Amino acid sequence: MFGRRFADLLLFCVTVTELVILFLLTPTFTITDWVYVLQHFIVLVIALTRRQPKVWDYSIASSMAVGAAYVYPYAQVIYLRWSPGYVAWPAAGLVLVTLAAGLSLVTLLTLGRLFGVRPALRGLVTSGPYGFVRHPMYLSYILADIGYNLQEWNSVTLLLVLVGWASLVYRIHAEERVLSQHAEWPAYVVLVRYRLFPGLW
């Protein structure tokens, strides 16, 4: 029980830290930025009220994957401040980032108190965006990564994105190993066949 409560406290503290970093690194806020701020405040509430998991993956590999997923977006922003990148297609990038923000917000609201960053079994959500793919939150991360890199990129940001995506793939497999213990999981997998990209994977 202590470990689980510590995880809730850690999520709360990390989210507060993310908010501080977001305000420090963002000179002017767009609507998309405010959507992400709103999401962070929602996570703060969830961290204090969410259900305790029935099963939890405490492995070092999962911890490393979660850490990588938290670090790589901010590492891109910081590196681009030190070494400016190239502009590819800003308009398309803005569209993707906006779509990603909307998808992640809807996904977070759909998850509610079942939200977590470490693979855990708190319940099974099959409604909303989870009726289209099994991991819509990670799809939003990928859309955002592509969008931000269309606005500005260099070889280092691309490398960071690849590392981040590798961590997401690991987390998907780790989460599905845990979720497979839910009685309704087999039926859900039949109903929603694809993890991230309909028709592909």
Please describe what each predicted stretch is:
Residues 1-118, 147-201:
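Membrane-anchoring alpha-helices and their flanking helix-loop junctions
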Residues 122-140, 190:
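Solvent-exposed interhelical
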